[in-house]
């Protein structure tokens, strides 16, 4: 069974993910399914942002391959099944500058290959059913606005880093932190 993992085409170009933790196996499965302009979002425990060993090597490869677009830390108690804070990862197979028609409008994306947007939503949300937190419509609108403004040409006019909320990190900054995304 271990030989099957080594030869699995989903890991093509990456380290073989460890059998002891499926997180990076899932990430590479998702990457293998992305189209040329594909975007994926998925949730993982915050520990996946800074795992060492093989996970670190895979994370470094994902960053060097310009796939990680955004890391969004969500508030605790957002889900019924766990009370821990989790992270929304957004991977994008094409972070290059391009123009795309969406809903009969042209969107002008800037080159973001050497950047990752970090957002921390742990201070957002409102109480829900006594023990849960929900992101309000205003919270969701703010997050999506920041994310989309950051992606666009001319973002200098519409996006700014906000302490404790959002930060656009360069590749060099992430490399300096040892490819840890926390």
Where are these predicted regions, by residue range?
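A conserved structural/catalytic subdomain of Rossmann-like adenosyl-cofactor enzymes
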Residues: 1-182
């Amino acid at each position: 069974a271990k030989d099957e993992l080594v030869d699995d085409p989903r890991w093509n170009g990456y380290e073989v993910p460890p059998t002891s933790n499926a997180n990076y196996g899932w990430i590479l499965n998702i990457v293998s399914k992305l189209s040329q302009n594909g975007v994926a979002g998925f949730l993982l425990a915050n520990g996946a942002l800074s795992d060492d060993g093989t996970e670190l090597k895979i994370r470094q490869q994902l960053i060097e391959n310009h796939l990680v677009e955004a890391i969004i830390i969500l508030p605790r108690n957002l889900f019924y099944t766990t009370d821990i804070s989790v992270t929304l990862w957004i991977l994008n197979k094409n972070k290059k500058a391009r123009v795309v028609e969406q809903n009969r409008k042209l969107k002008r994306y800037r080159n973001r290959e050497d950047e990752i947007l970090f957002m921390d939503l742990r201070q957002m949300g409102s109480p829900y059913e006594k023990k849960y937190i929900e992101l309000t419509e205003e919270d969701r609108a703010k997050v999506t606005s920041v994310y989309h403004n950051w992606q666009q040409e001319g973002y200098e006019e519409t996006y700014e880093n906000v302490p404790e909320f959002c930060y656009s990190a360069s590749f060099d900054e992430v490399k300096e932190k040892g490819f840890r995304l926390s």
